[in-house]
Amino acid sequence: MYHDVSYLLSRLINGPLSLRQIYFASSNGPVPDLAYQVDFPRLEIVLEGEFIDTGAGAALVPGDVLYVPAGGWNFPQWQAPATTFSVLFGKQQLGFSVVQWDGKQYQNLAKQHVARRGPRIGSFLLQTLNEMQMQSQEQQTARLIVTSLLSHCRDLLGSQIQTASRSQALFEAIRDYIDERYAS
């Protein structure tokens, strides 16, 4: 399987990798000692293999998605080889990673970051997905929200804005000032 982040996003959005079941991780109760817990929302998408997640209370298979809200936790029980695609929604950037468990150890297959800029589309989609936790049986709607969120991620990856360094920005500002006031 090819592990380029943009390619994976496109395959999840347009096929042939289709989203199946959307699960919602636990965000209440005591957190197990080795559980994964971060302050940002994230998606865990199974690409290959299968694993049981205590936080979701289910066995996840290819195409299944686990949504972990900010402050929530998940606790995967790796019993056979599996490959997952994770999207972490930080305040300033998105983080993408593809991780494989081969039955003995983890291997990072891909890792990428992109700045969260522009309209707050992603924030509103995450808020909508948070609301879906109360109606987790509405799977068609949950799949469409996750697909929209993945599409937004692909849009951000495709239009990465290059930010000039501070010295470059200062140089350009001085040059523009001189051009505006002293050019003849």
Please annotate each region the language model reported.
Residues 44, 125-132, 142, 146-154, ...:
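Hydrophobic alpha-helical core bundles mediating ligand binding, dimerization, or RNAP-core interactions
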Residues 40, 81, 165-168:
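Short, conserved loop/turn and helix-capping segments at secondary-structure boundaries
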Residues 47, 154, 179-183:
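Short, locally clustered residues in the helix-turn-helix/winged-helix DNA-binding domain
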Residues 32-34, 57, 137-139, 160-164:
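Hydrophobic/aromatic-rich alpha-helical bundle segments in the mid-to-C-terminal region
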Residues 1-60, 78:
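Generic protein-terminus/edge-of-domain signal
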Residues 118-122, 142-146, 162-184:
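A short, Lys/Arg-enriched amphipathic alpha-helix from helix-turn-helix/homeodomain DNA-binding modules
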Residues 42, 84, 184:
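Broad gene-expression machinery/nucleic-acid interaction feature
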Residues 1-23, 65-137, 150-158:
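A hydrophobic/aromatic-rich effector-binding and dimerization subdomain
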